[in-house]
From Swiss-Prot:
PANTHER family in UniProt: 3-KETOACYL-COA THIOLASE, PEROXISOMAL
Name of protein: 3-ketoacyl-CoA thiolase, peroxisomal
Active-site positions on this chain: C115 (acyl-thioester intermediate), H370 (proton acceptor), C400 (proton acceptor)
Function text: Responsible for the thiolytic cleavage of straight chain 3-keto fatty acyl-CoAs (3-oxoacyl-CoAs).
InterPro entries to which the protein is assigned, alphabetical: Thiolase, Thiolase-like, Thiolase-like_sf_Thiolase, Thiolase_acyl_enz_int_AS, Thiolase_AS, Thiolase_C, Thiolase_CS, Thiolase_N
Keywords: Acyltransferase, Fatty acid metabolism, Lipid metabolism, Peroxisome, Transferase, Transit peptide
GO cellular component: peroxisome
Record carries keyword Transit peptide: yes
Reactions catalysed, as given in the entry: an acyl-CoA + acetyl-CoA = a 3-oxoacyl-CoA + CoA
Taxonomy of the source species: Eukaryota, Fungi, Dikarya, Ascomycota, Saccharomycotina
Length: 414
């Protein structure tokens, strides 16, 4: 009867509330037993520039299975987020699972909810475990912006859509939405540059201290030099992190999207290549298999916001998750908020009343990079590593989503 009550609580639209509820341990909890990512490298310039998204994903999944020691035959589903590939990479990323040694009996699904795709993949697996459809699954995300980023990634709008005032806002360039947020909410250029410089500073310190080594799986690949000669390399470090970046230096950069604007290459996320993957399972199964439990996956929420202000998504997704759980921002120890742009990240932090010292302690996408479909999964690898090292418990991930949405999730470390 207790097990049925626990399961019923988990399946309710609104989960049990309060710190005691989220930190309790029940056999049917969804738990994370492994979370890894690849290094993130510069789009068109970095060591992954000649590596396809399918190759990236295959290498990461193979590494995840090896490091976790999970029997791949036990995996109930693999869900992969991707934004830029046709059909979210449904064909090539299914093939990547097979190359990684995951048997053909394990199904695969590709999904795309823009920059939250990696998180949506993790949440999809969690929901299937809660519903009793599977016991074990992998939620992952991957993006090769070197190979697939560009204007042709969006289908042209018909006259009907172009003449719909709300619908056509979905075509507003992301940089312009950043300018809209900065203008509407008075986020100054000076504040944005200071925030961006801090992201670089934190990321450089984390990299120098070897903190990212715990979350990054080295990937062997080949890269073409300037003479088109192939060279074998092992990629294990983010190459967009630059020590010595200051607000003063960033202040000299020209605006990228508007002559009078405040957004530029130094206070916006980097175009990047990379992947992330999270192994989830039912607590009772994890205990039976002797899998180390890193965290309990508690809740996830997605909200809609105006497309022209898409960056404010976290400002509304984070409170939505916390309200469902009967928590406040003060109950959260670490926030991983995607830095699509400094403007929107700063607004979201301030709108929610979050202590900025709790946000992105290892830096964020401005310094590390933002491979669109991978970020939501990457954040778990970074967050769980940080929670383990710091001894803290409650963590939140969040991001804005192109076309006007925001998503957030909450985990409790063990």
């Amino acid at each position: 009867m207790d097990r049925l009550n626990n399961l019923a609580t988990q399946l309710e639209q609104n989960p049990a509330k309060g710190l005691d509820a989220i930190t309790s341990k029940n056999p049917d909890d969804v738990v994370i037993t492994a979370a890894y990512r690849t290094a993130h490298t510069k789009g068109g310039k970095g060591l992954f520039k000649d590596t396809s998204s399918s190759e990236l994903l295959a290498s990461l999944l193979e590494g995840l299975v090896k490091e976790s020691k999970i029997d791949p035959k036990l995996i109930g589903d693999v869900v992969c987020g991707n934004v830029l590939a046709a059909g979210a990479g449904a064909t090539e990323h299914r093939a990547a699972c097979l190359v990684a040694g995951i048997p053909e009996t394990v199904p695969f699904v590709a999904l795309n909810r823009q920059c939250s795709s990696g998180l949506m993949a993790v949440n999809d697996v969690a929901n299937k475990i809660r519903a009793g459809q599977i016991d074990i699954g992998i939620g992952c995300g991957v993006e090769s912006m070197s190979n697939q980023y560009g204007p042709n990634s969006v289908t042209p709008f018909s006259n009907k859509f172009q003449n719909n005032e709300e619908a056509k806002k979905c075509l507003i360039p992301m940089g312009i939405t950043s300018e809209n947020v900065a203008a509407k909410y008075n986020v100054s250029r000076k504040a944005q540059d200071a925030f961006a410089a801090k992201s670089y500073e934190k990321a450089a310190a984390a990299q120098a201290a070897g903190k990212f080594d715990q979350e990054i799986l080295p990937i062997k690949t080949t890269v073409l030099d300037d003479d088109d000669n192939e060279k074998e390399v092992t990629v294990n470090k983010d190459d967009g992190i630059r020590p010595g970046v200051t607000a003063e230096k960033l202040g000299k950069l020209k605006p990228a999207f508007s002559a009078e604007g405040t957004t530029h290459a130094g206070n916006a996320s980097q175009i990047s290549d990379g992947a992330g993957a999270v192994l989830l399972m039912r607590r009772s199964v994890a205990e039976k298999l002797g899998q180390p439990i890193l965290a309990k996956f508690v809740h996830c929420k997605t909200v809609g916001v105006p497309p022209e202000l898409m960056g404010i998504g976290p400002a509304y997704a984070i409170p939505a998750v916390l309200e469902d759980l009967g928590l406040t921002v003060n109950d959260v120890d670490v926030f991983e908020i995607n830095e699509a742009f400094a403007s929107q990240a700063l607004f979201s932090i301030q709108h929610c009343g979050i202590d900025e010292s709790k946000v992105n302690p290892r830096g964020g996408a401005i310094a590390i990079g933002h491979p669109l479909g991978a970020t939501g999964a990457r954040q778990f690898a970074t967050l769980l590593s940080e929670l383990k090292e710091s001894g803290k418990k409650v963590g939140v991930t969040s991001m804005c989503i192109g076309t006007g949405m925001g998503a957030a999730s909450l985990v409790v470390a063990e």
